[in-house]
Amino acid sequence: MKRFALLVLCALALLGACSSKKPAGESYSANLSAYNHTEDYIHQFYVDGAGGGNSRPYGGGGSFVCCISSPAQWRPGLSATVKWTTSSGIPGDKRPEAITPRWHEKVVPIDRYDVPGGLMNVHFLPNNEVRLVLSNMRASAKNYPGPASPVKPPDWKW
């Protein structure tokens, strides 16, 4: 009888664990995607500790890395810590400062959103500026709320 009672208690505990849910609308997962608007090569980047891979100069948006959690509702002051390493993206640049990766870190505000999207688009801009756009669209989409996809300058040879 004790065994049966113990079995029933375990089964009830498991059922209770399976049925418990997070409150609706608490948070969403989004894939990370980088857009590099600079001539630097981005070796790696992280948003609140979630790794996002690398990005070539004036490139990005082609791959996604899972996942970062974001609140269902945007609020003033919502931000994330972005860390990344860069070096020169110009082939053959042998200057010590060009070949030694440099770490950068910034607390970056997340652009306002009405509906949380499935993509956290991380835009690396000139002068070590970063913009975070949570959207269901890529930067190439017509009504994308952030910066357009990076464009290589006409004199960029690589």
PLM feature spans:
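Bacterial N-terminal signal peptides that target proteins for export
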Residues: 1-8
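C-terminal motif of bacterial Sec signal peptides marking the signal peptidase cleavage site
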Residues: 13-17
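Bacterial lipoprotein signal-peptidase II cleavage site
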Residues: 19-26
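Short structural boundary motif marking the start of a folded domain
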Residues: 26-32
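Structural motif
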Residues: 32-40
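A short, structured loop/turn motif at beta-sheet edges
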Residues: 38-39, 72-79, 112-115
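Tryptophan-paired
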Residues: 45-91
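Beta-strand-rich cores of mature extracytoplasmic or soluble domains
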Residues: 84-158
